């Protein structure tokens, strides 16, 4: 009898935790961040022609998503988990310019043709909460 009361009390506490956690506000959003990008250019023989780098402002997904744990008689652990992660909903492609370009000897290019390099990258345009591990979307 005492064990049964303890189990019921535990499940009530667990239910309270699940309900209070799942009612929290989701705040998955697109946030600007700085990353260091390096791109190398090679000729047909595989020799390095130039190496360019720069700090680039890009979007990333950041925030919290509601996740839940439910008691379950069918699960071996006794609980069913539903986890959600903040991930990209849409990606957009854009060009960025790298402004620090060097020859294979490490000497910085001064001529306009070699001093800059355009690089195409993809970044999140919009973020959303998705079931963790679900890559089918």
From Swiss-Prot:
Compartments (UniProt record): Secreted
The keyword Ion transport is annotated on this UniProt entry: no
Domain of life, source organism: Eukaryota
Entry's Gene Ontology BP terms: G protein-coupled receptor signaling pathway
The keyword Secreted belongs to this UniProt entry's keyword annotation: yes
Subunit structure: Heterodimer of burs and pburs.
This protein's name: Partner of bursicon
Source organism: Bombyx mori (Silk moth)
């Amino acid at each position: 009898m005492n064990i049964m009361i303890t189990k019921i009390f535990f499940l009530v506490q667990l239910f309270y935790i699940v309900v209070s956690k799942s009612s929290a506000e989701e705040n998955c959003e697109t946030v600007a961040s700085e990353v260091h990008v390096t791109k190398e250019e090679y000729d047909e023989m595989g020799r390095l022609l130039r190496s360019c780098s720069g700090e680039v402002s890009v979007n990333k997904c950041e925030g919290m998503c509601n996740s839940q744990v439910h008691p379950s008689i069918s699960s071996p652990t006794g609980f069913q988990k539903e986890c959600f992660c903040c991930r990209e909903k849409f990606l957009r492609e854009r060009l960025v310019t790298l402004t620090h370009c060097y020859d294979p000897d490490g000497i910085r290019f001064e001529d306009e043709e070699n001093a800059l390099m355009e690089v195409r990258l993809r970044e999140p345009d919009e973020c959303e909460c998705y079931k963790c591990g679900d890559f089918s979307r």
